[in-house]
Every structure is written in structure tokens, then in C-alpha cells.
Amino acid sequence: MTTTAEQAPAAAPQAFSKAPGTGVALVTGASSGIGEDTAHKLRALGYIVYGAARRTDRLQALTADGIRPLAMDVTDDASMSSGVNRILEETGRIDVLVNNAGYGSYGAIEDVPIDEARRQFEVNVFGLARLTQLIIPHMRTRGSGTIINISSIGGRL
């Protein structure tokens, strides 16, 4: 099943309640699906939006909507630090973080190669945690911020 930003829970707009044009958002996994839709929705609400993904060639289409493409690999600390620093240098703030980058390796546990399982945890768990660690201090300093973590049924054991 595919879900779009329009199908998000009704409470979600409250998280994006800043006045138009006053917020800065970072959306990971913005090259397709929920991440891409979320980036467009935030932009329509007036946010300055940075759409992050490993494959920046797929992000170029977002620029027509005013979304700023950002090369970021959530398994690479230097890549995440560089991306966060760029946003802070250009705007001075990050008001919303949408952790949407994800990777799925499916199958019975005995059939999934352990390297694939590790990669999935690196992207879906440790990447999310590290990017959140990089951004929380800036949100704390400002006294506000919103972090949204997107997951999947794949996280259910």
C-alpha cells in the first residue's frame, strides 16, 4: 500500500502550524514517495524545504517547486553533518525534521543476508538517530522544533 502526504493523520497539520514562510524543513528520502509528497506539502505551506536523498539526480525535479536539493546519505556521518551545516549556514535554523529515508530488505530471517539486515538498520535506525542527534541541539537553542519519524510495517516484529 502506498501512502501520500494527503493521507497523513489529521493531527499532522498541527505540526506544521508556523506562519507561511517562517519555517525551515529538512525532509530525508525526498526523491520519491512519502518524502517527495511531504516536501511538496511543506513547501505549499510556505516552508523553506530542503529535500535530501542519496540520488540527487532524482531531486532536481523538486527545484521547480522551490525545494532545495541536498545530497545526503544517512549512513554517512560526514554527509549528514555537511547537510545540516549547509542548512544552518544558509538559513540559521531548522524547524522541522522529517526522517523519512528508508530501506527494506524482506524475507524470512534465515533467507536475508546479514549484510542486508545490517544495511537496513544503518538506514532505518542509526541514520535516523544520528541525524536527530545533529539537529536537536539547534532546536533546543531556539526553544522549538518538530521531528517526525516515518516508519513502515517492516518495523513490526
Where are these regions (language model features)?
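Residue(s) in the substrate-gating loop at a strand-loop-helix junction
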Residues: 152
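Conserved glycine-rich cofactor-binding loop
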Residues: 31-32
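Substrate-binding pocket helix/loop in short-chain dehydrogenase/reductase
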Residues: 108-109, 116-118
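A short, exposed helix-loop element centered on a Lys and neighboring polar residues
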Residues: 132-133
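The beta1-alpha1 cofactor-binding region of Rossmann-like NAD(H)/NADP(H)-dependent oxidoreductases
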Residues: 72-82, 114-115
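A glycine-rich helix->loop->beta "capping" turn
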Residues: 86-99, 105
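A hydrophobic alpha-helix adjacent to the NAD(P)-binding/active-site core of NAD(P)-dependent oxidoreductases
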Residues: 69, 112, 120-121
